[in-house]
């Protein structure tokens, strides 16, 4: 059942990517480009989870799953830049300031570097099954994903500012849903819920672009 859900998630992200490509000629901003990058990572993430049982346990699946963690480390902090660029595109004057945008990039690069050095380079994987899926997860996961948490909190704050400017709460709501959905332990629901709420956040980003 979970494998089917992740396949549906894969197709949904693919649909969002086509929507983003459709919106790009109208917007031509960096937010759309980065959204497409993040969507590429999520398509890969869900596809590998959905196909894990077919590929089978072993070095190949472990390597493919290690790439999942790499993409999460590299791409998740980009959500912060996307939110800031959307706020700028929406006409929030404060985010048009080059210094603010530079600081945003520096924070994002710092979060990527932190996640890559502290988590990915020390990553040890173990195989696990859930509801018919086979994937590799962190063998030792005693710390919170601080980079992802900080990213989503900052996106939620920016979402509030966009809400006040455009009278549209979608980014804030999407970030809030992702925050609480991702907080549910994977030992209870596997990655199904966390992958689902990622769709909500990215859909909220595209909805804002469409509205503008």
Feature-to-residue mapping (PLM):
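Hydrophobic transmembrane alpha-helical segments in integral membrane proteins
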Residues: 1-16
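Internal transmembrane alpha-helix with an interfacial aromatic "cap," most often the third helix
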Residues: 17-24, 40, 44, 48-61, ...
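Juxtamembrane "helix-exit" motif on the non-cytosolic side of transmembrane helices
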Residues: 22-25, 49-58, 116-124, 182-189
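Membrane-interfacial loop-to-transmembrane alpha-helix junctions, especially the N-terminal start
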Residues: 28-39, 98-102, 165-175
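Aromatic-anchored segments of alpha-helical transmembrane domains
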Residues: 40-46, 107-115, 175-187, 203
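Membrane-interface interhelical loops and short amphipathic "cap" helices
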Residues: 52-65, 126-134
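C-terminal transmembrane-bundle signature of multipass membrane proteins
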Residues: 76, 151-212
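Membrane-proximal helix-loop-helix units in multi-pass membrane proteins
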Residues: 84-152
